[in-house]
Amino acid sequence: MNRYAVSSLVGQGSFGCVYKATRKDDSKVVAIKVISKRGRATKELKNLRRECDIQARLKHPHVIEMIESFESKTDLFVVTEFALMDLHRYLSYNGAMGEEPARRVTGHLVSALYYLHSNRILHRDLKPQNVLLDKNMHAKLCDFGLARNMTLGTHVLTSIKGTPLYMAPELLAEQPYDHHADMWSLGCIAYESMAGQPPFCASSILHLVKMIKHEDVKWPSTLTSECRSFLQGLLEKDPGLRISWTQLLCHPFVEGRIFIAETQAEAAKESPFTNPEAKVKSSKQSDPEVGDLDEALAALDFGESRQENLTTSRDSINAIAPSDVEHLETDVEDNMQRVVVPFADLSYRDLSGVRAMPMVHQPVINSHTCFVSGNSNMILNHMNDNFDFQASLRGGGVAAKPIVAPTVRQSRSKDLEKRKLSQNLDNFSVRLGHSVDHEAQRKATEIATQEKHNQENKPPAEAISYANSQPPQQQPQQLKHSMHSTNEEKLSSDNTPPCLLPGWDSCDESQSPPIENDEWLAFLNRSVQELLDGELDSLKQHNLVSIIVAPLRNSKAIPRVLKSVAQLLSLPFVLVDPVLIVDLELIRNVYVDVKLVPNLMYACKLLLSHKQLSDSAASAPLTTGSLSRTLRSIPELTVEELETACSLYELVCHLVHLQQQFLTQFCDAVAILAASDLFLNFLTHDFRQSDSDAASVRLAGCMLALMGCVLRELPENAELVERIVFNPRLNFVSLLQSRHHLLRQRSCQLLRLLARFSLRGVQRIWNGELRFALQQLSEHHSYPALRGEAAQTLDEISHFTFFVT
């Protein structure tokens, strides 16, 4: 690092931080990516170093060049060329591009992606944040290969990394994937460049996944026929029907705008991604550099199941430069060579099947499918999308270029920012917005320093030192390291994608760094005292709350630490202070941004699951059966563990009923974390016994209340509740016959809501025993509120024909 002078932090993500720096020898401006070695196995670091060597060999005018890489005891440093701005920020500032500028940028991306695929490298994290631009609007791809997180034994949270805005349907549908997944993402980026927003937008991850899998793209009427044909080929949901490289390179939309080096043509013929007739060859490529690259790829140790040499990407580092950075010169387009398209005899123009792509919006649904939720037990109105349906029909062949007034463009830019999901959901990481909050960082450092000097018992070293050495967004790095699928899976012949819904994010012990539980308890106790004294500033700052939340992602945190975190974060809602009412909204917004609800749920599942395998076992190749972690039942838990789980879910329950953003995060987390298993584990307990622990009753009551809230406020997510309530393991009658008023009353409420939103499911479980249990509660119970609830439930269900069965 002595050769470089670091000037500023320009980006941060799941893998590390990106700094702008100047090389002292020649004053060249570079970007330095710092990747922490913390929590990484030796095998992971070995593969990471080899990937650096691979990237150093990649040379293309539209691929960010790696200058060098080196490492210290704690970090790996990757030095690359520096770019002015990314496409996401450009679109945020300027709105949608015209078709000509977008065509130019798309040509650059096609050139770069073709180069990667020619070298058997999949990107699989294509999005505007990974497209960097210089002052001349020359685009360069970044964050591939090296960016892949090497952690083993993880599936779920990796799959919906950042957001699935640009993920191909086959990935979301848990189908095998190949290079066609990159083609879909390329189409999403090109679409967003011209439309101002991605093809599919939603405020909920679950809703977004359903849209990508089932809804058709809405085409703006401003697109020319060439442009629409190009996008239709890329945004074909069936990867087998998606446009091929042969067709893409000859498409009139990008014809004449693609750069292919002469030496690349031979490599493209040998790559199965770019040439469908290519066979895997054991010999080196004819070109020496390509041969060296293939040799390096083959040397990667990915396990015995490897059958393909490819590299995939899963990074989300946003190398966003500030507006005052120097301009870079990458004038390549002016000196572009003649494009040589390999196997061009299979021209796009000769394929009538592609030319006959449907130009009409035709949603594919049947009479038993809910358009919004895909839930056959619900009937919901058809929801309109971003573009007018009739306008899309009328504008199928219009060739007019979009003319956007500056005011409209600015409005669209703001709307784009609002509509897009946080690009750093990354395993429930901290989202600090689109820029680095330097003031918040400064305050965090000052507070930590003052705390150190004023207290004899210093705060936890793990929390404070790590927080000061990395941006706040890096605090949840332990979880992020574990949220990626196995290398063996990525390199298998079928390329089986990570499991989406449901799944378990198996965070093995190696991904949870040692934690000083006693120091954490002292730190949390001091923080509680500060809140009781009226000092609320710490809970209004993202980075400080992220420090407090960090133990929730660490499997080595003891129950007392987790319970103290929940109690500390609950205090603002129970303190009676007129001034607090003003601050409460700020605190709630911070809780939303740091994804507190999913973190609490994740902590509870870590707490209640059986301990993970040893580090050596966790590093071994995983089978399907080893991916799921079993949960302990109520009799297997200690009183302290039950009390802790209850504290976690009581806070979740309060937040979910407080604000819909928390409810949306809860629904996403239930699906992503497969929390239905945890719910079933508790609700299947026999609460008819008199020895049921009070904490277990409160916890089960929270779960029933949460499911009722989902049905009331977000009925389109009723399927999440159905998976739990209608599971054969759950006997709903036993809940109605519980010895506890709370469980009986909330069970009646839940059943009434299910009859409204999941009637077919209620009909399946309805029987005489269930009807008798409700009648007993409505006629003979001494508790008036419960008796009234049961009577109301019976009254509503009695109107249906299956009631008497």
UniProtKB/Swiss-Prot annotation:
The keyword Membrane does not apply. One of its GO terms (biological process) is negative regulation of smoothened signaling pathway. ATP binds at residues 10-18, 33. Pfam families: Pkinase (PF00069). InterPro entries: Kinase-like_dom_sf (IPR011009), Prot_kinase_dom (IPR000719), Protein_kinase_ATP_BS (IPR017441), Ser/Thr_kinase_AS (IPR008271). Belongs to the protein kinase superfamily. Ser/Thr protein kinase family. This is Serine/threonine-protein kinase fused. The lineage of its organism: Eukaryota, Metazoa, Ecdysozoa, Arthropoda, Hexapoda. The gene is fu.
